[in-house]
Amino acid sequence: MVKMSHGPRSGSRRKLTKSAEERKRSVIGRFMQEFEPGDRVAIDIEPSVHAGMPYHRFQGYTGVVEGPQGDCYKVAVKIDSLTKYVIASPVHLKKIKG
């Protein structure tokens, strides 16, 4: 028997797979996004970009940008009564209107 992998991407095949339509789109514009502290964002992981990728558990969560951290942004995500901080590149974030 082969030992099961316990790496950071294990168990994420469906979350980190793009459809044929998504593979055609360029992500260059998403690299150029800028956020201000207090902006609400959704974590939408771009599987083709590994730099600044948050852990796949946070795929689909929403949070508030705390501020920049290097080339990435620190995002406060509230899960039940806990506040977790995710550091993600702008290509993995989408601004929420409102």
Swiss-Prot record:
Keywords noted in UniProt: Ribonucleoprotein, Ribosomal protein
GO biological process: translation
Pfam short name (any one): Ribosomal_L21e
GO cellular component, one term: ribosome
PROSITE patterns linked: RIBOSOMAL_L21E (PS01171)
Region (Disordered): 1-24
One GO MF term attached to the UniProt entry: structural constituent of ribosome
NCBIfam families: PRK04306.1
Family stated for the protein in its record: Belongs to the eukaryotic ribosomal protein eL21 family.
Protein name (Swiss-Prot/TrEMBL): Large ribosomal subunit protein eL21
The gene coding this protein: rpl21e
